[in-house]
């Protein structure tokens, strides 16, 4: 089984920081749980990232964007097969309109 290197873009890192900061306003323990769960699921993309579907937007799908849902957040990523890299591009609240943000 091929293993991929999972990397986070600066945008995705900031997105995750923003999620944690927002949730910390309500509960530090909830913020920590969300952070841990998002990281575990994102890092699981090192194995079989193709298990996640392509996004619904045609233009982004053509660019290779896929999504992974973690509770009420969505992790957007692309796979570089030639380099065996999963590039996490963004993490955002699932109800947001993602097409203009990616």
Predicted regions and their residues:
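Basic/aromatic recognition patch in beta-strand/loop cores that engages polyanionic ligands
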Residues: 52-81
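Basic, Lys/Arg-enriched alpha-helical interface segments
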Residues: 1-62
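Proteins with a high burden of low-complexity, intrinsically disordered sequence enriched in S/T/G/P/A and R
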Residues: 23-24, 67-68, 102
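Enriched for short, Lys/Arg-rich terminal
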Residues: 70-74, 78-102
């Amino acid at each position: 089984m091929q293993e991929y290197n999972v990397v986070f873009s600066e945008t995705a890192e900031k997105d995750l920081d923003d999620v944690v900061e927002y949730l910390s306003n309500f509960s530090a323990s909830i913020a920590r749980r969300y952070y841990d769960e998002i990281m575990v699921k994102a890092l699981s993309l090192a194995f079989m990232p193709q298990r996640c579907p392509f996004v619904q937007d045609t233009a982004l799908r053509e660019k290779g964007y896929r999504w992974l849902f973690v509770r009420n957040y969505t992790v957007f990523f692309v796979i570089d097969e030639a380099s065996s890299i999963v590039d996490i591009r963004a993490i955002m609240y699932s109800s947001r309109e993602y097409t203009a943000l990616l």
